Amino acid sequence: MAGYISDDTRKVTTHRLIEMKQRGEKISMLTSYDYTMAQIVDGAGIDVILVGDSASNVMAGNVTTLPITLDQMIYHGKSVVRGVKRAMVVVDMPFGSYQGNEMEGLASAIRIMKESHADALKLEGGEEIIDTVKRILSAGIPVMGHLGLMPQSINKYGTYTVRAKDDAEAEKLIRDAHLLEEAGCFGLVLEKIPAALASRVASELTIPVIGIGAGGDVDGQVLVIQDMLGMNNGFRPRFLRRYADLYTVMTDAISHYVSDVKNCDFPNEKEQY
């Protein structure tokens, strides 16, 4: 199946993302956590690579995103940046690195930027973290917001169900979205909210709105790379489209290798020195 490969090799920046929204060009975004995957994703033409705290789940096997540390996020960020030439690299600030006072948040943000060489950071929350967002922005660090389902708040809500289905929560989300834009955020992720609400937010904001489980009437889409490649065999949420079945492909390849080793078929004469 033929895919889309951009012939534009210029580095993606916050300014270019806003230009893409203005001309109606959708923004593509995927997660990556290591050098090899980042090279592949960047070479395939992705616009934004998110070094997500979802590494806690898909790389470390944790049930939630909460355990991943600042040092671990910096490690993953460094690994991804080394493999990228064109895409913008955004790193998630992990739980506990910015929810305290704003100066602690700024110190965490500066560490990530200095040590990983990422292009921007992403934070979950609205009004409750707006002072921290402003403080980080005042240091010249680009910030992307994240509203709707916020995995770092799983213990508050107790479930990963769709958020902002009632009027009160929807209105708060809209207010928070405007607060984040007014503070200076260059973009916003909306996760697992009604499509009509996401469409309204995208139409009201001048900054790009990227959806995950938020319908198609937004400015772009983001998915976890392991999910869209079909590497997590039992994970099939409604919003996910699987573009490959790598779980089966990889299992078959490894099984074939095991068989060849057991049967002394590998290495053969041509595979020796």
Curated annotation (Swiss-Prot):
<comment type="function">
    <text>Catalyzes the reversible reaction in which hydroxymethyl group from 5,10-methylenetetrahydrofolate is transferred onto alpha-ketoisovalerate to form ketopantoate.</text>
</comment>
<keyword id="KW-0808">Transferase</keyword>
<dbReference type="GO" id="GO:0000287">
    <property type="term" value="F:magnesium ion binding"/>
</dbReference>
<dbReference type="InterPro" id="IPR003700">
    <property type="entry name" value="Pantoate_hydroxy_MeTrfase"/>
</dbReference>
<comment type="similarity">
    <text>Belongs to the PanB family.</text>
</comment>
<keyword id="KW-0479">Metal-binding</keyword>
<feature type="binding site">
    <location>
        <position position="92"/>
    </location>
    <ligand>
        <name>3-methyl-2-oxobutanoate</name>
    </ligand>
</feature>
<feature type="binding site">
    <location>
        <begin position="53"/>
        <end position="54"/>
    </location>
    <ligand>
        <name>3-methyl-2-oxobutanoate</name>
    </ligand>
</feature>
<feature type="binding site">
    <location>
        <position position="124"/>
    </location>
    <ligand>
        <name>Mg(2+)</name>
    </ligand>
</feature>
<comment type="pathway">
    <text>Cofactor biosynthesis; (R)-pantothenate biosynthesis; (R)-pantoate from 3-methyl-2-oxobutanoate: step 1/2.</text>
</comment>
<dbReference type="GO" id="GO:0015940">
    <property type="term" value="P:pantothenate biosynthetic process"/>
</dbReference>
<dbReference type="GO" id="GO:0005737">
    <property type="term" value="C:cytoplasm"/>
</dbReference>
<feature type="binding site">
    <location>
        <position position="92"/>
    </location>
    <ligand>
        <name>Mg(2+)</name>
    </ligand>
</feature>
<dbReference type="InterPro" id="IPR015813">
    <property type="entry name" value="Pyrv/PenolPyrv_kinase-like_dom"/>
</dbReference>
<comment type="subunit">
    <text>Homodecamer; pentamer of dimers.</text>
</comment>
<protein>
    <recommendedName>
        <fullName>3-methyl-2-oxobutanoate hydroxymethyltransferase</fullName>
        <ecNumber>2.1.2.11</ecNumber>
    </recommendedName>
</protein>
<dbReference type="GO" id="GO:0003864">
    <property type="term" value="F:3-methyl-2-oxobutanoate hydroxymethyltransferase activity"/>
</dbReference>
<keyword id="KW-0963">Cytoplasm</keyword>
<dbReference type="InterPro" id="IPR040442">
    <property type="entry name" value="Pyrv_kinase-like_dom_sf"/>
</dbReference>
<keyword id="KW-0566">Pantothenate biosynthesis</keyword>
<feature type="active site" description="Proton acceptor">
    <location>
        <position position="191"/>
    </location>
</feature>
<dbReference type="Pfam" id="PF02548">
    <property type="entry name" value="Pantoate_transf"/>
</dbReference>
<feature type="binding site">
    <location>
        <position position="53"/>
    </location>
    <ligand>
        <name>Mg(2+)</name>
    </ligand>
</feature>
<feature type="binding site">
    <location>
        <position position="122"/>
    </location>
    <ligand>
        <name>3-methyl-2-oxobutanoate</name>
    </ligand>
</feature>
<keyword id="KW-0460">Magnesium</keyword>
